[in-house]
Regions:
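Signature of N-terminal electron-transfer/Fe-S-associated modules in redox systems
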Residues: 1-156
Length: 156
């Protein structure tokens, strides 16, 4: 079946089988930041934005994106690089395999709750599994990024 959608701000068409998963489609189109970690919608590595909302692409049929907008980390490079520097500064990147999904969910958090407290941050990111870190570095990175962003906005 033929589908038409927007991928990272570009109109895209693809021929897919009815059982094709979104993760497989976006990876076949060159979006390698979308990782497959569990195939059970439990790890957060496959997070993408579907119409600006985070979804786990391993649990979404590609046919459901027809006429919609999909954004991966490749489509958010400037925003992701700005935030990613704060994660790296806290030594929270470790092996880096989980970073794309973690960054996508953190960016979704910032959009939904511009000034979250620590509990809201932990709750929002609970679906991201990282086998290398204790999550404290990620939490500090988020808090430092939010403080920097707030001071930047205040200065303007």
């Amino acid at each position: 079946m033929q589908i038409h959608f927007t991928l990272n701000h570009k109109k895209t068409a693809a021929e897919i089988a009815p059982d094709t998963l979104l993760i497989d489609l976006v990876r076949s189109l060159g979006c390698k930041s979308v990782k497959c970690g569990c195939e059970t919608a439990n790890c957060g590595l496959c997070t993408v934005f579907l119409d600006e909302k985070p979804v786990l692409s391993c649990s979404v049929l590609a046919a459901r994106v027809d006429g919609r907008s999909v954004t991966t980390l490749e489509g958010l490079q400037e925003e992701a690089a700005e935030f990613g520097a704060f994660i790296a500064d806290q030594g929270a990147e470790q092996c880096g395999f989980c970073n794309p999904g973690f960054i996508m969910n953190a960016l979704a958090l910032f959009r939904e709750k511009p000034d979250p407290n620590e509990e809201e941050i932990k709750e929002y990111l609970a679906g991201n599994l990282c086998r290398c870190s204790g999550y404290e570095g990620q939490l500090r990175g988020i808090q430092n990024f939010l403080a920097w962003k707030k001071s930047k906005e205040t200065a303007q």
